[in-house]
Each structure stands twice: as C-alpha cells, then as structure tokens.
Amino acid sequence: MHREHEEMHQPSRRRRPPREVERPSATIRYEPVAEPEPWCSFCSWDLILILLVMLGAGCFILLHLYLYPNLEKVAPLPNIDPENAPYTWGTYRPHMYFGLRTRSPMSPLFGMMWYEQPNTIQRPHIRHWCNQDDRLPGYYWYEADGRHFGKQNISEAHKGVIQTDWINDANGFAARVKLNMAPGRRYNVILYLSAQEIGTRFRLGKHLSDVFHGYNELLGKFTMSLRLKDNTKLQTSHSVMLTDEKIPIDRYHDFVVDNTQAYNAPNQPLNYILNEKHNDEEGKFIAVQLNLGSQAEFDIILQTEKLKGMKPEEFTNILRIRSYNFNKKYENVFQLAGKNYTKTQLKMAKVSLSNMLGSVGYWYGHNRVLFNGIVQPYGPHVLFSAVPSRPFFPRGFLWDEGFHQMLIRKMDSKMTLEAIASWMNAMDTSGWIPREMIVGSEAEAKVPAEFIPQKNDVANPPTLFYVMDKLVNDEKTVGRYAGILKLLYPRLEKWFHWIRITQSGPTRTTYRWRGRNETIKTELNPKTLSSGLDDFPRASHPSDLEYHLDLRCWLALASRVLNRLAKSYGTDADYQRTAKAMEELNNFDSLVKDHWSEEAQGFFDYGKHSFDVALSPVPTPGSPRQFEYQRVTSRAPSYTLVSDAFGYNNLFPMMLKLIPSKSPILKSMLDKIRDPKILWTNYGLRSISRSSPYYMARNTEHDPPYWRGYIWINVNYMVLSSLRHYADQPGPYRENAENIFSELRANLVKNLATQFQKTGFLWENYDDRTGEGRGCHPFTGWSSLILLIMSDNLDT
C-alpha cells in the first residue's frame, strides 16, 4: 500500500526592513585595519560544489527513507530445525539432476554433470540442471526420505540408465553412481565442488582416492575421494580443473565445456578432457572429469577430518537399512498393499512421495519486492520448502506449499513444521508473505527478470492453514510438537489479519483478491494471479466493488484453525476473538446471501460483469492493416453474480466443508460435479464447465487456456476430501457422495497411472478430453497427492 505523501512546509522567510541611516554625532578619524581574506580564496569552488552535492544527496536519502520506508521482516522464530541441520548433507538443490548441500548458507555446493562423448569435435550437450529440453524419457527418485538417503534413476532415450544413490553420515556424505548404458557408448561425468563464501577454499589432491582437499568455516577441513569399481578402473581416465575465478552459478556447465579440450591420440578414439593448466594453487571451484565406458560404477565420499573413510560394504549396508526403514514406514502410513492396485499404480504412488521428499530445497538470501514503486531487496531469508517442478518451478510457492505439506506430513510431520516455520519467517511486520520465494542467485537464474519482483499488497491462498487444520486435529502431532505449534500460532494469526484487512471487500463479510488489472484491453478476462487460479474467469470488468468466493472460504477455514490454536495456546481474549471471527466467516446464511444464485443453483463471485465479451481483432490506430486482439463487450456490464463461469472456484464452499450435510444446496453441488456436461470426465473433474463461454477460451492472443478446462490434481484432491467428509456425515446425500467419491478416485488413479507408464512422469495438469499429461513435467508438486488419493486415510 502506498503511503500518502506529506507536504513539507518550510517557515516563511520575511525580509527585514532596511535600517535608517544615522548621522554621526562626531567625526572619528579613520584608521585602516587589515581585513581577513575571504574564505573562498583558500577554499576550492570544486570542493564547495562537492559538499553541496553530498548535502543534497544526504537530504534526498533522509527524505526518501521518511516517505518510503524499507520493508522490515519480523524477528525470526526460535530455531526448530534439527541441531545438526547446518552440517547434514541432502538433496537440497532440487533444480539439479544430482546435487547436494547442507542447510547452511556457508555450505559448499556439490554437483554432477555428464554428457555422451562425441566421436567428432563438437560442443557436447551437457546435463546439469533439470531441463525439459534435454528430453529425458524419465528421471525420478523412486525412494527418498528428504533427510538421510535417496535412490534415483535417470533415463537417457534409447541409451540406458544412470543411477544415483546417496546417504549422509554426520558431517559428510557418500554417493554411488552407476552407468548402465548401451554398449559401445562412452560418457564423461564431471563432479564438482563450489564455494558460496570467501572462507571456503579447495585444493587438488594427487590421485582419485584423494581427489579434492578443502577448508570451510562450517565443516572445517574435508576431503573428497572417488573409488572406482574394479572393472571400471580398466576403462577410465580422468582430468581435473581448479580455478579461483568467480563463475556465475547458472554458468557452471558452460564454464566446464569452455574449458574442455579434444585429445586425439594415435590409434585412439577422440577424448574430451578438462584443461589441466591451472594458474591457481587453490580456488573456489574445483572439478574432476571421469571418462567412462558404457558400464561403470564409482563411489563419491566427502568426509571431514573427524570421520574415517566409508568402505563399499558400509555404504551398501547403510543404504539397505535406510531403504528398509523407509519402505516399512511407507506401508504403515499409506497401507496400499492388498488394495488390488496394479504394479504401475503402486510404482507411481511411491515415486510421487519420493520425488516430493527428494525435491525439498534450501535457499538463503534476499528476494526482490516492488515496494512503494521501487524494487527493493527483502531479507535475508532462510527458506526450507518443497517445489512444484524440478525443471520448471524449482523454488518456493506459497499457494502450492500447503498441498505439498499435506503429503509430506504423513511421513514426516516435523519436516512439515520446519517448512511452515521458514515460510512464517519470510513475513514482514505487517503480516505479508511473498507469494513466490525467488531467493538467491540459483533461484533467480530460473526466472525471467521481469517476473522476479513480488508485490507486497498481493496475497495468495493461505493453504498452509489447510495442512495446519490436519496437524492441530492430530493428537499425536499436538502431543509431540505442542511447543512448535505454540510458536506458530501468533504468526498465523498475524497473516490471517493481514489478509482480512488488505483484501477486504465492499462489505464486512466479503473479500477481494488484489492485483487485477482494471485498464487492460488485451485480456478476455483480466487474470487473478493472486488467487492461484490465474485465468479462471471472474467479473469481466474489475472494480473495487467486486468480491470473490474462494477467498471468503479460505478465510473461513483459517478462522477455524486459529480458534483451535487459540484454545490450546492463547489467552481467553484470543479464544473469544478467534471464536467471533470463526462464527462470522463460517456463517452459512451469510455465505448464501453474498454468493448464492438460486436461478443458477451455484455459488459465484460478484462484480461488474458482462455476459457477452469476446476477443476480437481490432485495427491498430495509424496502421489500419495491422490488428491487435482486444476484449470487445457487446453487452454493457452490470453488477451481478458471475454465473456464466462454473468450475473449481465455485466448489470452495463444499471443498472447505462449509455446506451443512443436510442442505439441499449440497445436492445441487453433487449433481453439477457428476454431470458430464459440466465438470465430470473419465479422467477427473475439469476446471470449468463445458457449457461456459470461457471453456478452453484463450485469455489473450498469445495465452492459451490454463484453468479453463484442464484437470488439476490439487482441486480434485480437495473435492475427494470433502466427498469423504459428506459420505461420513448423517444426511440424505451421504450415499451419493460415497458413490461419486469412489468413481472419481478410480478415474484419477487409472488415468495418472496410464500417463505415468506412457511418459514416465507426473504432469502439471491433464487434458479433460484425452487424459493426456500437459504443462511442465516432472511435476513433483501437488500432482503427487495421487498417493493420498489412493490411500484410505486420505483426510486424516
């Protein structure tokens, strides 16, 4: 929110009246007196100018700080992370095929690159950061707990599989890499360490068993060694590289390729090796390249002075034990055995969880915020969060994170609380949390510059309350982590109040997402990015008098969670205050009054809306032969319920369980869900009714539909959760809810498994006409909720 500029008033300076000249009463003899030289004679005019400029700049800075104060973070919560978190290595670089670091800003970064050795001189296509353009047929963690170990397969099209397994141990880690590629092919694998802070230095060792030495203020002295399996040694050569240059973190792979040279020995195939001419004895980037055959296996061990080297059999045993414990807990929690799922469905289920946990990331640094018209650094932040997609969205998203943690909490509720606490620490003193956490240079490298700044008046769905609702109603979690829940309660309430105040609507019980563009002409329906539903149709002509159904429902859920927390951890006044908010926001009669249409039999947004708009080519002024697609309104807009767009947004009263189980309105909602002309498909619920004029409609000439027909798993999960609730409640519609639940679950599981088997991935969304996966892939985010959908404890 912009502050009003205060006028700066200066006191008026009145000119003094001239003094009257007095006549002397006596004549005084004049005695010449030596006058001092004017100060300007010994003071340079250049110096005067510099001083004036400095004074002006100082005044400007002080005035700017007064009128435009900086964003200020809340004080961090007491640390709830494990004591050894800064020293414990994990896969906290989710954008990489295989990368490790610790949860400390001082951690060195470990990474792996590889490419197939060309037979002719050319620039190799190197794999490093996850990239859809690499066109890999599949890569996923098939077992991973997000803390102690992981097992991953990376498939190369028609060439074979690279397997990466890892474990951590005290202050170090060990990894095993296996290449099982097509015969006759050769591969180069590059392993590197890079420094994040000045005090970290690396040196080269003398052989592979002592390949790197390093020092770091966090870890102390450490070494990295490579151990090749016997049959691998015979067909392996290696080269090393060390530099003290400052390399941009997103250009590591380019730097490696630029410093690679072709070596063509007589009667030998062409070999690419690293340039080993080193001008530095120590540096902040160090790499070793292994030239391997198609079948190879080697171990990587990073250890501090305090630890002994790990033997191959020790790695194998520890990995086996951790894998066993993971699988045992997995089955105890989700209980999929004996449920008649196919092998493909069971494989997809475990991959969905493992990818979610194996893609949890750690970031440190500032993000950028557009505050009072100026982009400012905001931070520093420490973010511990899952991500939606390793290649496309490898960073924290506030609206996604609540869904991520719905799954993670089932295996590791402590990890969920650590993630929620890190998001609460990103809050500013007013209660705002950035909707997208693009923190640090690695995260920024994956985002176009114009999309990096966040706006501090824009909210996002408070989905963390969705997972908190489950945590505070779980007796085991409450008993074990009461202290953490007590710490989180004031932050959650602050966030809740910020949303209620800044996103308020025209009346007390209505709310409006900020950020819609009232003047844009090139969009069919101006987007509501803050809602998370992006191009889902709202009122066609944005105004301050509109209000939004989903936001009202999110706040109703949040009020219930806060009341539960206040009862356990707040004062009597806290409890009374939250009870009042809960009663107001969960009042069904009020919801019906504000949002229900008896004629259309649905809940809807309200606003300035036209039922007759279209994107049409309009001649460009001054260039009659050129056209621009603009919104053309054939019928004047009026203030009304937006009843020509029924879809995901309109299901929120049911999804968040605000409709009484005996209300006829519930029957109407169930009927619309099951109607193939509206939302029902054989693959899941589509995002908007087929009868809506917005179904599969482009929002601009260049923007295809997004939330206008395709099937999204997070909302289907919310619908299933509510169906399970209503099927268990007394009322005339419980049998109908049970039947729809069973059919919808079966359709989702069958289609996602079909697409997983066909493509090797979970996808961002799915086509409502064919069931095919769409958008970015692999989508390790809320599409992984398919595992909860498959389990019987979907909503506990």
Swiss-Prot record:
One of its GO terms (molecular function) is Glc3Man9GlcNAc2 oligosaccharide glucosidase activity. It catalyses: N(4)-(alpha-D-Glc-(1->2)-alpha-D-Glc-(1->3)-alpha-D-Glc-(1->3)-alpha-D-Man-(1->2)-alpha-D-Man-(1->2)-alpha-D-Man-(1->3)-[alpha-D-Man-(1->2)-alpha-D-Man-(1->3)-[alpha-D-Man-(1->2)-alpha-D-Man-(1->6)]-alpha-D-Man-(1->6)]-beta-D-Man-(1->4)-beta-D-GlcNAc-(1->4)-beta-D-GlcNAc)-L-asparaginyl-[protein] + H2O = N(4)-(alpha-D-Glc-(1->3)-alpha-D-Glc-(1->3)-alpha-D-Man-(1->2)-alpha-D-Man-(1->2)-alpha-D-Man-(1->3)-[alpha-D-Man-(1->2)-alpha-D-Man-(1->3)-[alpha-D-Man-(1->2)-alpha-D-Man-(1->6)]-alpha-D-Man-(1->6)]-beta-D-Man-(1->4)-beta-D-GlcNAc-(1->4)-beta-D-GlcNAc)-L-asparaginyl-[protein] + beta-D-glucose. A motif (Endoplasmic reticulum targeting) lies at residues 2-8. Pfam families: Glyco_hydro_63 (PF03200), Glyco_hydro_63N (PF16923). Keywords: Endoplasmic reticulum, Glycoprotein, Glycosidase, Hydrolase, Membrane, Signal-anchor, Transmembrane, Transmembrane helix. Glycans are attached at residues 153, 340, 517. Disruption phenotype: RNAi-mediated knockdown reduces lifespan to less than half of that of controls. Reduced paucimannose and complex-type glycans and increased glucosylated oligomannose glycans and fucosylated N-glycans. Chronic endoplasmic reticulum stress response is believed to be due to the accumulation of triglucosylated free oligosaccharides as a result of impaired glycan processing. GO terms for biological process: oligosaccharide metabolic process; protein N-linked glycosylation. Residues 1-46 are cytoplasmic. Residues 1-10 have a biased composition (Basic and acidic residues). One of its GO terms (cellular component) is endoplasmic reticulum membrane. Residues 70-130 are annotated as: Required for endoplasmic reticulum targeting. It is found in: Endoplasmic reticulum membrane. Residues 68-796 are lumenal. The active site is at residues 534, 764. Its EC number is 3.2.1.106. The keyword Transmembrane applies. Belongs to the glycosyl hydrolase 63 family. Cleaves the distal alpha 1,2-linked glucose residue from the Glc(3)Man(9)GlcNAc(2) oligosaccharide precursor highly specifically. This is Mannosyl-oligosaccharide glucosidase.
